[in-house]
């Protein structure tokens, strides 16, 4: 303990700054330019991306043109089309709801069956366990019946002795 009388200090000397700069201010990595794989990616990506963007614009323009042409027809035939759309929409919603409820019921049934199988074992084991439980319950009921019969006999004897005592007095 006595050999540490003077405080110790730590000095940190940085040789590299942030982002790869050295202490002298020059970059550690010389400017080599983009790699060939990056150049190939840009060369192939730009035409493909441009083509897809062109197709998206054409699809939007076609949709707007079709909507502009068919809107007057929808307005003219709306007394027929609107109820038909409502009927078709409700039918589709009904089928989807029916399928969702059926799938939910099936998955719930599957979960319950897996839970029963994992928790309680196989069917023969369940039957054996049920037999043992029934035997235990039958033994318990038999013992209780004997106890109640004995208690009834004792109460009857007490009443008989009290009745005989009351006749004597």
Swiss-Prot record:
TM helices/strands, residue ranges: 39-59, 73-93
Cellular component aspect of the GO annotation: membrane; monolayer-surrounded lipid storage body
Record's compositionally biased regions (Basic and acidic residues): 146-156
Domain of life according to the entry: Eukaryota
Pfam entry (one): Oleosin
UniProt region (Disordered), positions on chain: 146-169
Chief localization: other
Compartment(s) of residence: Lipid droplet; Membrane
One annotated GO biological process: lipid storage
Role: May have a structural role to stabilize the lipid body during desiccation of the seed by preventing coalescence of the oil. Probably interacts with both lipid and phospholipid moieties of lipid bodies. May also provide recognition signals for specific lipase anchorage in lipolysis during seedling growth.
Family: Belongs to the oleosin family.
Protein name: Oleosin Ara h 10.0101
Taxonomic source organism: Arachis hypogaea
